[in-house]
Amino acid sequence: MQCFLRDTDARMERGENEMLSQLVSEVRDVAYSIEIIIDTASILARENSRPPSLLGAISKGACYPVHCKRLYSIGKKIDQVTARVNKIFEEFAKYNIHSTCLNETRYSMDENETLRARRLTLPDLGDEVNVIGFDSEINQVKDELLDSENKDLTVVSLVGPGGAGKSTIARKVYNLVAKNYFNSCVWICISQKFTVYGVLKDIVNGVMENQDSQELGTMSEMEIIKKIHSFLKDKRYLVVLDDVWRMEDWDMVQAAFPDVKNGSRIVLTTRNSAVSNHPNARKIIQQIKLLNEEESIELFNRKAFPSYVVHGRGDLDSFRELGKILALKCNGLPLAIIVMGGFLSKNLRITEWRRMVASVNWDAMKNEGDIKAILDLSYYDLSSNLKACFLYITSFPEDYAVPVGLLTKLWISEGFIPNVRGSSLEETALRYVEELAQRCLILIEKRSSRCIKTVKVHDVLRDWGIGRARREGFLKDCSSRNEVETSYSNEMRAYRVVLYDSVRVKVGVAMPNLHTLLIFNAARLERNVFSFRGLNYLRVLYFDGMRERWQLPTEIGRMVHLRYLGMKGGTYVLPATISNLTNLHTFDARDAIVEALPIDLLSISTLKHVHIYKVESWSVWKTTMQSNLESFFIVLAANTPKQWEGAIERMEEKPSWCFGKHYQSVKQLEIVGACEDEFGVPNDLHLPDLQLLPHNLRRLKISCPNLLNDEDPMPTLGSQLTYLNVLEIGVKSYTGATMTCPFSGFQYLHNLVLHDLDIEEWILEDGAMPKLRILTLCKCTKLKALPQGLQHLKELKKLQVIAMPELDQVLCYLLHKAGREVIIRSSEEHFEHVQIP
């Protein structure tokens, strides 16, 4: 059926038959029905295969009639779906739609691409802060912000069409001046669907630390404005209002900004010149010019011919000539050039480039900011999986920095990531992120030396993607009750809903059979109206922006098809019925507090990932873990030391709750402790036996004061964890003076981080860490010299020494002379911890 849909997709791209959209909608409905049947059958099979016992046999016999009834129901549904599938294939024949599997040429990142994808290096990914043609504008805006003679509150407006580079210029200048020249700084995205309360709340959270969210939730808009005004009147502040659409948007928030003649500044970006002239304050208007011919060609070449594409090719002259034509046809609009270059970098076929020159309706580019033709081309060039991944990113609010760890877990839970030979689903998902970045469909917001951390979508691409997602029935974005309940004639029925604000409607009643529910700004969710009823087929549920305590209703236990449950912000109380979620793959509360963790949660047989920021109560001695867990971490944070004392005593007796035999499949583990002042955790917590760690661990981070005491952990870790790739030990986890990496230990370790330890001597025995590539030492101030054995590590590529002024740097010099990358920094500002996904 996927093969037939590709032919339908291609024909709809050519605009051959709009009636095909109804057929596509029917196929999607059937596909969701099939998924529900398969899930239901799997759940039934698991229930029927529980370990035998006398009580289990009695229970099984008593439930046998119910079991037969459910089997019969599944059979009936299969018959109904089969009939619908047969009817669809009849429609395929009617419209002369054929399978395209044999002649599929559209780019697809399958297993044949795995080796090539692994060769892609992150520095080659699009870095939108590295701008071309904007040096003059950047310097002018910077000079206006820092003009010492102008003490008035001044609004500096950047005006230009969508995709012209307004936000890029503003971001560049903001990064240059914010910290060094202003007391308070905040960046706020306005967007078309902004709420006054939401913007004011973001300003408060941006300029005031440790703000009480509950107090803020009880305040009126005018009270918040007065609060901001009172706070800023003693500060020299910089506020960026990005993407302001209407004059009244400014009117609603301007009262929050006092003019106390101290050189405070507001930067405003807009497509509407009337908005730039509207503020009742001193105004400086900067019209953003489009790129000239030389700049357009330079930007296009940078995006269309990255080093990993052109390496070894000798036929680029013809491409460059066509590239000049294409770059100039974009009329100097940077976003159009970037997306075009990203698209063509994946299509280095001369016939494709010539087709682009001849067939695209370039007249549309003459309209301000209209790059629909280029976006259509880039989108249709994606595989079906990448299309879904891109549209999914557009569901996040405008200017939202999307954590890659969250994004990949959502993609996997949605079923967008295929199984690729030799790669895990997580690895494939990360390559999808890289692929979309290389195509310039997403922006890299933050990255480390080894991975992308957060991404964004340009507002023009997001608007385009949201519109397409609605038309295709991929998702429905809603900011009001009317949008939830209304079906539009040009939209297919959606199975995914995104709520951006408080919506007084029972979503499950308005949209039965819903597949995905994403809720942003959840602090404004009216929980007395919101209900889980009717959401029994939900697979993905995510709350973002909760600020208060919320006891989830017991009805959540009915959502047996749920694969992903995510929470960000706030404190959650989980009902015991959560253990009924027998299809759950990921429980993600890495940015939330769980007040009490049900003891049966970790016994769910399908559960693979558990990430929790803080657990306030957990009966660890009663908890059993199933064997399929792949990643698990919790910031250890109980409220009373007595609870921990009891837990540790029992942990020594029954270590399976965290490190024992039932936990041996875990491949990555983070053990993090925090200070007693902040979390109430006693710093005398210790690990009873390192040999209880899972032997197949790939990544390990230990960052808990005194956890290892003064017993050197390296001999045990080096011999027991034979597959370990990444290791970080920090924050005085080990308190001894000597650290010894044993002979032939750590055979597969390639990244080692030692942070804030009191070691005075480090011994590296022969044969230890032969594959080490990256070594980072930070704030180990008592260490005077590096081990001589580092010179003999042939695979060592990079050494970082941070905040260690007393270290003898002779060995650093020798390593640098031998061609290794050596970085020495006096401040730990840029130190990066190991990331456990």
Residue spans of the language-model regions?
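N-terminal flanking helix/linker immediately upstream of nucleotide/cofactor-binding cores
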Residues: 84-164, 168-177, 189-191, 202, ...
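Cross-kingdom leucine-rich repeat
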Residues: 229-231, 237, 261, 478-495, ...
